[in-house]
Amino acid sequence: MPKLGMQSIRRRQLIDATLEAINEVGMHDATIAQIARRAGVSTGIISHYFRDKNGLLEATMRDITSQLRDAVLNRLHALPQGSAEQRLQAIVGGNFDETQVSSAAMKAWLAFWASSMHQPMLYRLQQVSSRRLLSNLVSEFRRELPRHQAQEAGYGLAALIDGLWLRAALSGKPLDKPLAHSLTRHFITQHLPTD
């Protein structure tokens, strides 16, 4: 009889092992056997919880997108009466949270984006994540700007966030957070009306 609570522990072990494997060898070279070995379980456990490698990759990406959502929401909930500028910076901060800019997370996101072009479930996850970012940004800009300008500013800030993140991921170096925050802050202040 399985131990109570073991499913969540095993799932966490396997997702962490998947991130480690992707970080070291990439998504395509990360085998079920390697992931199982890293997690200290049999390959059958992966099949039991996730069906196959694609199921495990989907669960891993759901976990990373959930961490992103939590990082943003935690910052926004800390600013219930915050200005649009403060709340936009909170969204930026959530996107540059350590859970999203660690080497393992960055490599997983890159692999996820590439695979999403060919796998419908990953594509849907990618679209949800992108729409959530844009919706959050536009909503905050909308507090200060007409709809069309808010949409343009939201799209521009989303592109800046993604661009800064992508440049760091492809450089193999950690994201320069002070620079990223400075550039995004400048963008935000340029698009919000001055008092």
From Swiss-Prot:
It comes from Escherichia coli O157:H7. This is HTH-type transcriptional regulator BetI. The keyword Repressor applies. Residues 8-68 form the HTH tetR-type domain. Transmembrane segments: none annotated. Repressor involved in the biosynthesis of the osmoprotectant glycine betaine. It represses transcription of the choline transporter BetT and the genes of BetAB involved in the synthesis of glycine betaine. It holds the Pfam family TetR_N. HAMAP family: HTH_type_BetI. Pathway: Amine and polyamine biosynthesis; betaine biosynthesis via choline pathway [regulation]. GO terms for molecular function: DNA-binding transcription factor activity; transcription cis-regulatory region binding. Residues 31-50 bind DNA. InterPro entries: BetI_C, DNA-bd_HTH_TetR-type_CS, Homeodomain-like_sf, HTH-type_TetR-like_transc_reg, HTH_TetR, Tet_transcr_reg_TetR-rel_C_sf, Tscrpt_rep_BetI. One of its GO terms (biological process) is glycine betaine biosynthetic process from choline. Keywords: DNA-binding, Repressor, Transcription, Transcription regulation.
